[in-house]
């Protein structure tokens, strides 16, 4: 199964994350299929490629709960739901 999940980066107590598409059997920080974006919770910045995320969701990639929440806040999940109905 292919998942969209977060990969942790950064040093101790200063995390940043990459949103990546991975095989569910791969370790959290293991190799990934494709990079969708960057998330920096310290500065509150998100740089996501919405079109790429929607493309992978249409292909059947399953987002984790945290990723789904982030996609909802960015408005990407709403775009995906609208494209799914059309």
From Swiss-Prot:
It holds the Pfam family Ribosomal_S16. GO terms for molecular function: structural constituent of ribosome. One of its GO terms (cellular component) is cytoplasm. InterPro entries: Ribosomal_bS16 (IPR000307), Ribosomal_bS16_dom_sf (IPR023803). One of its GO terms (biological process) is translation. NCBIfam families: S16 (TIGR00002). HAMAP family: Ribosomal_bS16 (MF_00385). This is Small ribosomal subunit protein bS16.
């Amino acid at each position: 199964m292919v998942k969209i999940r977060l990969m942790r980066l950064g040093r101790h107590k200063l995390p940043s994350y990459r949103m990546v598409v991975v095989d569910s059997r791969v370790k959290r920080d293991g190799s990934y299929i494709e990079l969708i974006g960057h998330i920096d919770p310290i500065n509150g910045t998100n740089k996501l490629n919405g079109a790429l995320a929607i493309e992978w969701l249409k292909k059947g990639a399953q987002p984790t709960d945290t990723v789904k929440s982030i996609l909802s806040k960015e408005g990407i999940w709403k775009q995906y739901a609208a494209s799914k109905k059309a």
